[in-house]
Design a protein with these regions (language model features):
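Membrane-interface interhelical loops and short amphipathic "cap" helices
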Residues: 27-39, 104-111
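Membrane-helix interface/capping segments
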Residues: 57-72
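Ferredoxin-reductase
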Residues: 203-290, 308, 342-344, 355, ...
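Functionally critical transmembrane alpha-helices in membrane proteins and complexes, commonly lining
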Residues: 36, 40-56
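Alpha-helical transmembrane segments of multi-pass membrane proteins
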Residues: 14-29, 56-58, 93-96
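Canonical alpha-helical transmembrane segment with a positive-inside/aromatic-interface signature
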Residues: 177-184, 194-216
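FNR/FR-type flavoprotein reductase catalytic core
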Residues: 7-11, 15, 45, 49-52, ...
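Alpha-helical transmembrane segments with an aromatic anchor "belt"
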Residues: 68-82
Length: 428
């Protein structure tokens, strides 16, 4: 079974068990006598706290998360979903309590203003930190370094949520199993937050490099970095997070880029397209600039090992994780198909390299696809070379619309979802 399904199923199982534990906590007959608004508030608060905590674990970049979700890309997608649902649930937790108090003619202040019991105040602080973060993220355009600092508010929110759970008189405090279950996930979220903030670079591997060769070809920067000390050890198709340290003209943001190769001189090669504000500032790099590299990440090499006839489809700069991967697959005797789609021939940076491989290896089927003259590449074009697409494993990397469209077409041609691996880097 595809490991990303394991991760998704685990999330669903955790929510299911949490719901059962909450219901079992009311097995004494209190369920029937519990106000429906109070029951809803309890459900939203407990499930929301668990999902919110899990979102920290999913964004920690821990190795087990990468393998459990078939790569950090899928883990981050689930992180965004669990975080969003958890946030909505947590925000509506006090809303239902306020509504209940209003209907009963009771005071609503204790749910909105931290002036009542300290256990309630902890919960209010947690919500305030969450709301502040949402306002800063959605309505105020902040520089990246400031935006990143504001995300410590999430840690503060989690901390106060834990204090709220530990001190509030509720089913969580009265039922030991439910209490330990919820507290475990809150603590796990806290540990993940601390790990991501202080430990992950040390555990994963951090390396100091300097800029050696730098050139621009059209909209693409070709960058070769050389180690200042220990060098990174990576497998084909992997990527790393780069951060420029000492050039004030380049943002100190940390971004993931595919490792094209590690050359014979020990230099690590990247090809980066000028897409957003950050990548455009890379044009200010100069020889000798210091660059921090964290990694490597990525599991393409593990997927490659399991499939004897891989099909690679790359769009534009999406070719970068496949350059060394294709050569590795050919050297190991696999029959390899590569479709390299670019708008015009000048964008095909690695065309000559692949042509040389096609001359060298009879087990290599290579096709350069010029979309400006032939239109976008689709499953029907690939099917002209491969009759039964359903028996192949596909690696796809490129612009998201291209990947989504191709996946849909391949699925319509009978290719299983588990046999399509899409590499993307939406990791913020």
């Amino acid at each position: 079974m595809n490991t990303r399904h394991s991760g998704n199923l685990l999330i669903i199982l955790i929510v299911f068990i949490t719901t059962l534990l909450l219901l079992s906590a009311k097995s004494d007959g209190s369920l029937g006598s519990t106000n429906i608004l109070l029951l809803g508030a309890q459900f939203l608060g407990i499930i929301g706290a668990v999902l919110f905590s899990l979102s920290f674990v999913l964004s920690s970049r821990a190795r087990f998360v990468e393998y459990l979700f078939d790569g950090l890309g899928d883990a981050y997608k689930v992180h965004h979903i669990t975080g969003a649902i958890g946030f909505i649930f947590l925000i509506n937790h006090p809303f239902l309590l306020v509504l209940k108090a209003f209907i009963n003619g009771s005071s609503t202040a204790m749910y909105l203003i931290p002036v009542g019991p300290v256990s309630y105040s902890y919960g209010i602080y947690a919500i305030y930190f969450l709301l502040t973060l949402i306002v800063l993220t959605l309505f105020i355009k902040l520089p990246y370094n400031i935006w990143k600092v504001t995300h410590t508010f999430m840690g503060a929110s989690l901390f106060f949520a834990l204090l709220h759970v530990l001190n509030i008189e509720s089913d969580v405090s009265r039922n030991m199993v439910l209490g330990l279950w919820v507290e475990f996930f809150l603590l796990a979220g806290g540990v993940a937050f601390i790990y991501r903030l202080f430990l992950y670079k040390k555990v994963t591997g951090t390396y100091l490099y300097k800029v050696g060769h730098f050139s621009a070809v059209g909209e693409v920067f070709n960058l070769t970095l050389f180690p200042e000390g220990e060098s990174i050890k990576s497998s084909v198709g992997q990527y790393a997070f780069l951060k420029v340290l000492n050039n004030k003209q380049v943002s100190k943001e940390e971004h993931p880029f595919s490792i094209v190769e590690i050359n014979e001189m020990g230099g690590i090669v990247f090809s980066v397209k000028k897409i957003g504000d950050y990548t455009r500032t890379l044009g200010n790099l100069k020889s000798g600039d210091k660059v921090e590299i964290v990694g490597p990440f990525g599991i393409i090499h593990k997927k490659l090992d399991a499939h004897p006839e891989p099909v690679f489809v790359a769009g534009g700069i999406g070719i970068t994780p496949f350059v060394a991967t294709v050569e590795e697959a050919l050297t190991s005797g696999k029959k390899v198909y590569l479709y390299y789609s670019v708008r015009e021939p000048a964008e095909a940076l690695y065309d000559e390299r692949f042509k040389e491989l096609a001359e060298k290896f009879s087990n290599f089927k290579y096709k350069l696809w010029i979309s400006n003259t032939r239109g976008k590449i689709g499953a029907q074009n690939i099917q002209q070379d491969i009759n039964d697409l359903s028996k192949k494993f596909f690696f796809v990397c490129g612009p998201k619309p291209m990947m989504d469209s191709l996946k849909k077409q391949l699925r319509e041609k009978g290719v299983k979802s588990d046999d399509i691996y899409m590499e993307d880097f939406t990791l913020r």
